[in-house]
Amino acid sequence: MIAVIFEAKAAPAHQARYLQLAAELKPLLADIDGFIDIERFQSLTTDGKILSLSWWRDEEAVRRWKQNVFHQAAQAEGRESIFAYYRIRVAQVVREYTSETGEYVDL
């Protein structure tokens, strides 16, 4: 399982546009083979900071999303006019713990 962590700080005047783009792209994710889930968060301590956490079956699924033309257009707009800063981290999940079993599962 792959986690993609997108951390960004939107320029104050463009934060609403980011949220609009994110809402427009979200339905397209369901069409990507290997997409599992996505959640978006807004920092309580850093004004304008947002985080998007998405889960994918494997790196190939992440590549398919990265190649989506609508996603590419949104990325270009984000780089050009929305974000003052962004960082993307891609991580492989090696283990999962749950409160239900108290045990971990190697993934």
Show the residue positions of the predicted features.
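Conserved short loop/helix modules at catalytic or binding sites
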Residues: A74, G78
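Short S/T/G/P-rich N-terminal loop/turn motif that feeds into the first structured element of a domain
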Residues: M1-I50, R57-Q67, F83-L107
